[in-house]
C-alpha cells in the first residue's frame, strides 16, 4: 500500500513538473503573411500661399479617406520571459500601395489661374502611400501551448507621393492588438507549426510641411488583418 501511495505521489509531482515547464509554442522564430483592409485619413492645418500669383492668400485643404486592401509580410522572434509573458520582436512590410486621394485646395474669394478658379475648390494633387514598413515589439500573454493574445508597440515609416512625382518620408508610432492560435503541425521537409492570426493596428504619421505655402498635413492609418504564419521548430 505504501508503495502504491508513493508511486501515485511521484506521478502527480512529475505531472505538475511537466506542466510547469511546458512552454508556449510561440516561443520561437516566426514568419507570417496577412491580408486586410486599411483606412488612411488626412488632416490639414491650412495656411497662406507663399509663391506665385496667389502669394499671401490664405487657403484651406481637405482630402477624402483612402480605403485600400493590405497584404503584409512579417518576420521576427518571440522570447518567453515568464510562463505568462512572451516578448516578440518583429519587422513588417506592406506589399500593396494605398489608393490615391486627391487634395482639394480652397482659396475663397479669388479667381485666376489653373489651380484656383472662381474662388472655388479645385483638385490640385493626389497622394499615394507606398514602401510601408514597421518594426515593433509585441508583449504577449500565452493561453496554454497554442494560443497567444498580444499587443504591438512600434515605429512605422512610409513614402507619401504627390501628383508631381515627389515624395516625403513620414514616420510615426504604431500600436496594435491581436490574437494568434496554432492550427496544425507541419512536418514535411521543414518542421514547425502553422498558426492563424487576427490583428488591428493604428499608425499616426508625423507632419509634412508644404513647400509653396505655410501649414502642413498629416496622415493616420487604421487597419485590420487576417493571416497565416509559421513557427519554426
Residue ranges, per PLM feature:
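Cleavable N-terminal export/targeting peptides
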Residues: 1-27, 233
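Gram-negative outer-membrane beta-barrel domains
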Residues: 21-233
